[in-house]
Amino acid sequence: MKQYLDLCQRIVEQGKWVENERTGKRCLTVINADLTYDVAKGEFPLVTTRKSFWKAAIAELLGYIRGYDNAADFRQLGTKSWDANANENAAWLTNPHRKGEDDMGLVYGAVGRNFPKVGGGSVDLLRQIVDDLKRGVDNRGEIYTFYHPGAFHMGCLRPCLHSHHFSLLDGTLYLNSTQRSADVPLGLNWNMIQCYTFLALMAQITGHQAGQAFHKIVNAHIYEDQLELMRDVQLKRTPFKAPTLKINPDIKSLEDLETWVTLADFEVEGYEYHPSIQYPFSV
């Protein structure tokens, strides 16, 4: 929690204003931030200086694992996070690749689970990683990525948290996640949860101990209409002790995650938090 608040304070004090063409808003921006989540010690990075809807963040992660490309599927899992980008993004609404209401196109897990190959066909990146790790293999390229510039025109949004690189060392599984852009008050709040949970799940289904998740953020920003709430409200609050995340031990395979796992299989214990803050969301 401290490292997140330190980043927020750094942006407020040292950030530079940048015009964002997609949203038409200014962003107070810094370049490069590195966050670490110790899954081995159970240090769940859940924001306590405002109420965080952790269930929706995990629901979104499950959708990425399953390769969903429709906002309705994400809603069924328990999150409305893709409703706006699927149905209110002006550029996407006029895109000939859009299939209709709730269609997100080729984004995130829909790319990673069906990564296009040169010359035709596709690769299921996550399946390859899980199969390798279950056999104790780390080929130094166990990367689940959603980043495919050749397919950007076929989706409603370029991926922000775009790559997850798993590494196995002496029986312990580590994760290096890379994020090109982070809406720090809103998106990063969820992304931290997702990096932690993804490593915990992958370690559990491949039979390894979980180590640390290392989270690299390139462009970290606060939108101009979020700044006052961050500076004058959230950063004035004293954080509570970090809670813990409990995952159903019966989750033992990728097939489990693809089929029967729901939010009921996750529980957060000891979560104390300050009142919620309604930060504006930019489409």
Curated annotation (Swiss-Prot):
Binding site for (6R)-5,10-methylene-5,6,7,8-tetrahydrofolate: 183, 282
Compartment(s) where it occurs, according to its Swiss-Prot or TrEMBL record: Cytoplasm
GO molecular function: thymidylate synthase activity
Pfam entry (one): Thymidylat_synt
UniProt keyword Zinc-finger present: no
This enzyme's EC code(s): 2.1.1.45
Ranges annotated as spanning the membrane: none
Catalyzed reactions: dUMP + (6R)-5,10-methylene-5,6,7,8-tetrahydrofolate = 7,8-dihydrofolate + dTMP
Enzyme class: transferase
Pathway annotation: Pyrimidine metabolism; dTTP biosynthesis
CDD domains: TS_Pyrimidine_HMase
Source superkingdom: Bacteria
Binding site for dUMP: 22, 180-183, 191, 221-223
Subunit structure as annotated in this protein's UniProt entry: Homodimer.
PANTHER family registered for this protein in UniProt: THYMIDYLATE SYNTHASE, THYMIDYLATE SYNTHASE 1
Family classification: Belongs to the thymidylate synthase family. Bacterial-type ThyA subfamily.
Function, as annotated: Catalyzes the reductive methylation of 2'-deoxyuridine-5'-monophosphate (dUMP) to 2'-deoxythymidine-5'-monophosphate (dTMP) while utilizing 5,10-methylenetetrahydrofolate (mTHF) as the methyl donor and reductant in the reaction, yielding dihydrofolate (DHF) as a by-product. This enzymatic reaction provides an intracellular de novo source of dTMP, an essential precursor for DNA biosynthesis.
Entry protein name: Thymidylate synthase
Gene name of this polypeptide: thyA
